[in-house]
Amino acid sequence: MVRSRTIKRPPQQDRSRVTQERILASASALLEQRGYAEFTLQKVCKESGLSIGAIYSRFSSKDELLRTIQEKHIEELDTDVMQIVRKLAAQGDSLQSTAPAVVKEFSELYRKHQSLLRPLMAIAAMDPVMAQEGKKFDTRTKQQFRHLLLRHKNGIKHPNPERAVDNCFEVVFASVTHVLGLGTAPNVMGTAPNVRSKGIWRDFVEDLSQMVSTYLLSEHSGISKGELVALNAERRAGR
C-alpha cells in the first residue's frame, strides 16, 4: 500500500521560512549537480551552511526532504504547463499550426526542467509516494495536451481523434524523456549528451512535430468514422 505524503506544516515565521527555502534550494542544487547517488543530508548541510539539527527540525528524514523538493518542482511544472495552455489557446489558429506548436512547447518544458527531473524521476522509481505524485502530474499534463489538440477535433483525420491524441502524447512523452535521459543516471543514456547541441535538439523536435502533425492530418485506412460510431454504439448498448 502506498503511504500518503506526510510533510510538516509550513513554517510560520519569516526567519524559519527563509531557512527552509535555503535548505530546499541547496538540496535541489545538490541533487541536480550530483544526482541521488551522492545526495546526503551531510552534503546538504555543507551546501547550505546549516547544521543537521536545522534540517531535522524541518524535515523528519531524507525521504521527506526529497518529497518536498518534488512537490515544489511539480508546482513549478504545473505553472509552466498552464502558461503553455494560455499561450497556445490565445493563438487559436488551426490544427496545422497548433499540432507542431504543442509538441515543441511540451518538449521544451521537459528540456527546461531536465536537470532536476532526471534525478527525481529516478528516485520515484524506488519511492511509491513520489511515483504516485509523478503520475498525477503526468495525468494533468496529458489532459492539457489533449485539450489543446482536441479543440481542433474536426481537423483530425484519424477515425478516433481522442485515441489519436492520446497516442501522440505517449509518443512525445516517451521520445523526449528517452532522448533527455530522464529517470536514469546520466551515464546510462547514450543519447542524452547529444541534446546538449542546440542544433541536434532542434532537429529532433522538428522531426517529432512533423511526425505528430502528419499522423493527425493524414487520412487513415481501415475503420471509417461511420463504422467507429456504430461500433461504439454497439459497445455502449452491450454494457
Task: List each language-model region with its residue ranges.
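N-terminal positioning helix adjacent to the helix-turn-helix/winged-helix DNA-binding module
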Residues: 12, 18-26, 164
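Short, basic, alpha-helical segments at the C-terminal edge of helix-turn-helix-like DNA-binding modules
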Residues: 41, 71-78
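Secondary-structure edge/capping motif, primarily at the C-terminal ends of alpha-helices
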Residues: 84-91, 117-124, 152-153, 179-187
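Short hydrophobic clusters on alpha-helical segments that form packing/core surfaces
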Residues: 23-31, 77, 106, 172
